[in-house]
Amino acid sequence: MYALTNCKIYTGNDVLVKHAVIINGDKIEAVCPIESLPSEMNVVDLNGANLSPGFIDLQLNGCGGVMFNDEITAETIDTMHKANLKSGCTSFLPTLITSSDENMRQAIAAAREYQAKYPNQSLGLHLEGPYLNVMKKGIHSVDFIRPSDDTMIDTICANSDVIAKVTLAPENNKPEHIEKLVKAGIVVSIGHTNATYSEARKSFESGITFATHLFNAMTPMVGREPGVVGAIYDTPEVYAGIIADGFHVDYANIRIAHKIKGEKLVLVTDATAPAGAEMDYFIFVGKKVYYRDGKCVDENGTLGGSALTMIEAVQNTVEHVGIALDEALRMATLYPAKAIGVDEKLGRIKKGMIANLTVFDRDFNVKATVVNGQYEQN
């Protein structure tokens, strides 16, 4: 048992000073005033840094020089996790983009192997595709985009303990498939979609509760057709992920989206291999993607994921969007936890929660993380 002291604590509800967080095993034992700490308690002095719940990234294709699609193994997930810790992300959804059924099965096996060893780190796969709309494919390979079929939907449902989320284009897939996934406990997200406003609204009735990278690879909101963006704005209960790197979405649009969506707006990175690594290019599902000036683009200039980290997403949200730090932190912790239904154990600093925490200074440098109660200095 030990206590984290001399820090500003962002609990998810309050901002506390002159308090300590006591950690026992893998859980938070208590949050208490500093004067009530037992004198014999082991103490870690955080030198006035900020302490928040560990960041939760619901869309991570790769980082630290590796891509999940490129090498679909538990080792790749582990490399991603270790790279994440440098930027304060303690839990994430390894994201497999559009690929073959065989690769999807491989990803399920890799996720199962990793999650059996390491709880509360990978929270389940995010299958981004292949059930998308070719019109909004982005970097996804047209060779593998296809409608959902009964066999694979059954396979996905049978492995719902290691699959957290599926992104699909509802206009190209059966509502029964969406309903089946939802019934199995999987979050279904609208994305890479050319749906109209009314098609999107219908899909929310089928059980879709999330939207993948708001504004990107979806029909925009225009005067006579509100599109998918309008449908998301018009449906308060639907969550939306947003990429706050300054390239995918204008910061003013993030500010407007936050005014409308509030606690349903979630920071995601959609990161690729260059996040937390030094590299000029990488291969993304057989395509060469170049990393230049913070941007990841293919030879046609199509964005191929980001090089964003979660701490940078929080910093950009505070400094460029103008959202207060405590709310920006909730967008990276509590709201994603709620979106995938893990907020009973992650996303807040309070008694009984899993001790996944992030320590960062006023300049947004991550100083340390706590994962399952284990304190690790950066």
UniProtKB/Swiss-Prot annotation:
Record Gene3D superfamilies: Metal-dependent hydrolases (3.20.20.140), Urease, subunit C, domain 1 (2.30.40.10)
The enzyme's E.C. designation: 3.5.1.25
Keyword presence, Iron-sulfur: no
Cross-referenced Pfam families: Amidohydro_1
Matches recorded under PANTHER family: N-ACETYLGLUCOSAMINE-6-PHOSPHATE DEACETYLASE
Membership in a protein family: Belongs to the metallo-dependent hydrolases superfamily. NagA family.
Protein name in UniProt: N-acetylglucosamine-6-phosphate deacetylase
Organism: Vibrio cholerae serotype O1 (strain ATCC 39315 / El Tor Inaba N16961)
Classification lineage: Bacteria, Pseudomonadati, Pseudomonadota, Gammaproteobacteria, Vibrionales
